């Protein structure tokens, strides 16, 4: 009986190890990117560790202007002002935006930020928008839950959530255009660094006070 069961036990253990390894391989590290809207260029950094993400907005001088701590498990967002040493909870009261779109996943490939990226195109006639994403697959499991937690109304986020089977990828380049081809905004990853992140990055710094609305 033992000899009969042994192969099944070994197979079960092997499958369990594979599942654990797959979970453990979720991306952890830093993504640095820019957002261009007209003449305005803003730099950002995403620090990622499991279900927690730290978003930093970087000034032209390289200084951190603002921070958001996002917990995709608890669906919470905390805004931090380094200059004023204040933090506040960001309520999520906005209803998800409903848009009518068509999605095309092409076979076009491009090398970007050290990744082979595939071209995905999302169009909406009623919204007068065409979104082109060049996506990389590297167990970026945090990204869709991040967009859902932030619940932003900008088209770069809204249109990406319209794509089926969008889990585990990250757009190394996202271009928003009007139907006539005029560019509205551009998100472009400049650098991806894998590596363990300190838990303290995702905590409110000591000595910071909570901002209370009157």
Positions of predicted regions on the chain:
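Sec/Tat signal peptide C-region and signal peptidase I cleavage site
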Residues: 18-24
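Extended soluble regions of mature proteins
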Residues: 25-214
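Bacterial N-terminal signal peptides that target proteins for export
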Residues: 1-12
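Absolute protein N-terminus
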Residues: 1, 24-25
């Amino acid at each position: 009986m033992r000899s009969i069961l042994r192969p099944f036990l070994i197979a079960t253990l092997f499958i369990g190890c594979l599942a654990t390894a797959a979970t453990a391989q979720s991306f952890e590290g830093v993504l640095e990117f820019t957002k261009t809207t007209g003449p305005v260029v803003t730099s950002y950094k995403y620090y990622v560790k499991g279900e927690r993400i730290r978003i930093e907005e970087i000034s032209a001088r390289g200084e951190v202007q603002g921070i958001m701590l996002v917990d995709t498990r608890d669906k919470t967002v905390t805004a931090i002002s380094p200059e004023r040493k204040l933090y506040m909870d960001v309520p999520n009261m906005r209803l998800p935006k409903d848009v009518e779109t068509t999605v095309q996943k092409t076979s076009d490939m491009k090398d970007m930020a050290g990744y082979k990226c595939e071209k995905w195109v999302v169009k909406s006639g009623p919204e007068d928008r065409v979104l082109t994403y060049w996506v990389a697959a590297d167990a970026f499991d945090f990204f869709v839950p991040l967009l859902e937690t932030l619940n932003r109304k900008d088209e770069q986020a809204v249109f990406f959530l319209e794509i089926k089977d969008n889990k585990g990828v990250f757009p190394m380049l996202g271009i928003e255009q009007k139907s006539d081809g005029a560019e509205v905004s551009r998100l472009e990853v400049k650098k991806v660094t894998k590596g363990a992140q300190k838990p303290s990055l995702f905590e409110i710094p000591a000595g910071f006070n909570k901002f209370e609305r009157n």
